[in-house]
């Protein structure tokens, strides 16, 4: 069912409103298009229309569900506040949990290999994390404190707890999920100094956490898929391999310890290779054979390596829709 919101932008010229809408759409590579009476842009399966109503510009927002609707409300609020004109919405769910936030409880934590720990969470709406995005943001409250969760304020913006109540907010990949049973699994790469690593060492069953999403990319739709990444990318690579159609062709290359790389379930046409160290990632990307069409190359590792991979892929002639190179962490800290 389609959901709707509307807002006025009093005191803002139409051209300034259009510039703010373009700024809001830019991170999603969503171009504006002309529609009768105004301009529209498509984001996350929803639509935002800007039109001149009377003397003031107005927004009309539609989305396939409430989560996306209120995520758009938050994003548009940010863009138009930056333009000096907060939208006046016809509806704001003030005090509600932030859009896309579910509260779940820890069921179990177990070591699945020397370098990885698997956490199972349970929640009534776990099923929604099985589509529309591979990733989610894990919200961890400070140890020993009563959690304060992000909520919607009077302007439709998400307000996050600050100071001593600030949440740790790492991003993880859904490793497995059973929507009917109401649980999802994710894997933590165990490393010194990691906030989630420390949390997983001591957390007890029944502990409450926030899970926000889903988000990020989805399974590449191309017939030939190349996946390359380091330890931090292994959960996403494993998830993608498990969701690829049977006829998929290509290969996966992971820089990870041998003890941490099982024989991952995958289509018969997808080869799996282990790389020795992060220094082998870019050479593997340079050497891999990629067809001229119906292709997708997925790369995730340290931020600087991802930037180099992006340049390399562009030099090989791949377009934006044929590749992804993401920095999952930075040498100076987590991304």
Predicted segments — roles?
Residues 1-335:
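Extended, composition-driven regions rather than compact fold-specific motifs
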């Amino acid at each position: 069912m389609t959901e709707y919101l509307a807002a006025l932008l009093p005191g803002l010229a139409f051209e300034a409103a259009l510039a703010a809408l373009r700024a809001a759409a830019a991170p999603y590579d969503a171009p504006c298009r002309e529609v009768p009476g105004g301009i529209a842009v498509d984001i996350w399966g929803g639509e935002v229309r800007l039109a001149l109503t009377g003397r003031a510009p107005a927004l009309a927002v539609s989305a396939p569900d409430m989560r996306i609707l209120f995520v758009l409300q938050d994003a548009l609020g940010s863009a138009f506040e930056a333009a000096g004109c907060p939208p006046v919405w016809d509806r704001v769910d003030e005090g509600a949990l932030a859009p896309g936030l579910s509260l779940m409880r820890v069921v179990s934590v177990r070591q699945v290999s020397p370098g990885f720990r698997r956490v199972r969470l349970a929640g009534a709406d776990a099923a929604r994390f099985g589509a529309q995005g591979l990733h989610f943001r894990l919200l961890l409250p400070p140890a020993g404190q009563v959690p304060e969760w992000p909520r919607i304020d009077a302007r439709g913006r998400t307000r996050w707890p600050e100071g001593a109540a600030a949440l740790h907010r790492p991003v993880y990949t859904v490793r497995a999920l059973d929507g009917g049973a109401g649980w999802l699994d994710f894997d933590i790469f165990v490393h010194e100094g990691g906030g989630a690593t420390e949390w997983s060492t001591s957390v007890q069953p029944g502990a409450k956490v926030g899970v926000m999403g889903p988000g990020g990319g989805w399974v590449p739709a191309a017939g030939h898929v190349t996946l390359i990444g380091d330890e931090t990318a292994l959960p996403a690579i494993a998830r993608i391999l498990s969701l690829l159609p049977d006829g998929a062709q290509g290969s996966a290359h992971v820089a990870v310890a041998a003890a941490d790389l099982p024989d991952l379930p995958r289509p018969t046409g997808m080869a799996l290779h282990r790389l020795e160290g992060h220094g082998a990632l870019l050479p593997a990307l340079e050497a891999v054979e990629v067809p001229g069409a119906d292709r997708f190359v997925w790369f995730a590792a340290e931020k600087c390596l991802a930037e180099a991979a992006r340049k390399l892929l562009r030099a090989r002639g791949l377009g934006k829709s044929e590749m992804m190179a993401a920095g999952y962490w930075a040498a100076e800290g987590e991304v």
